[in-house]
Amino acid sequence: MSPKTHTLSVLVEDKPGVLARVAALFSRRGFNIESLAVGATECKDRSRMTIVVSAEDTPLEQITKQLNKLINVIKIVEQDDEHSVSRELALIKVQADAGSRSQVIEAVNLFRANVIDVSPESLTVEATGNRGKLEALLRVLEPFGIREIAQSGMVSLSRGPRGIGTAK
């Protein structure tokens, strides 16, 4: 059986060293973290980690149990596409001289992305969406020449009233 992609929302205490301990746990077990985003929550003393990892179900259950044993981990929820919304952010610098600029902008607009910087030889594009949308945009922009990409990790929230329970 091949590994599948899992998205974990991990609510943690906002203290020094917590990220290092969580990442070390994945590393010790031989997991490669595909995407990691960490940020503030509505509670000032807590942070949310969104971790995307490829794993079979049994090893993932084991690592989830071990994560729960870490003193600063408050709660872990596995997100799925049906019950959550997820987004990534990409900044893409595309080669675009005066001759190709309008074509690049037209492609960017099809993906509801935004041009956030213009120079004589390039455009910088800001795009948000799921991984599939961002990969499709990159394929469309590839023929123009992609100079640079900076991409965030995935962030994810449960749909509707369901959540990780960060409110005190």
Swiss-Prot record:
Keywords: Amino-acid biosynthesis, Branched-chain amino acid biosynthesis, Isopeptide bond, Transferase, Ubl conjugation
Gene3D superfamilies given in the database record: 3.30.70.260, ACT-like. Chain A, domain 2
One GO-annotated biological process of the protein: isoleucine biosynthetic process
Source organism superkingdom: Bacteria
CDD domains from the UniProt entry: ACT_AHAS
Reaction catalysis annotation: 2 pyruvate + H(+) = (2S)-2-acetolactate + CO2
Pfam families named among the record's database cross-references: ACT_AHAS_ss, ALS_ss_C
InterPro entries per UniProt: Acetalactate_synth_ssu, Acetolactate_synth/TF_NikR_C, Acetolactate_synth_ssu_C, ACT-like_dom_sf, ACT_dom, AHAS_ACT, AHAS_small-like_ACT
Record-level GO cellular component terms: cytosol; peptidoglycan-based cell wall; plasma membrane
Pathway participation: Amino-acid biosynthesis; L-isoleucine biosynthesis; L-isoleucine from 2-oxobutanoate: step 1/4; Amino-acid biosynthesis; L-valine biosynthesis; L-valine from pyruvate: step 1/4
One Gene Ontology molecular-function label: acetolactate synthase regulator activity
Known partners and oligomeric status: Dimer of large and small chains.
UniProt family annotation: Belongs to the acetolactate synthase small subunit family.
Function (record text): Catalyzes the conversion of 2 pyruvate molecules into acetolactate in the first common step of the biosynthetic pathway of the branched-amino acids such as leucine, isoleucine, and valine.
Name of the protein described by the UniProt record: Putative acetolactate synthase small subunit
Species this protein is from: Mycobacterium tuberculosis (strain ATCC 25618 / H37Rv)
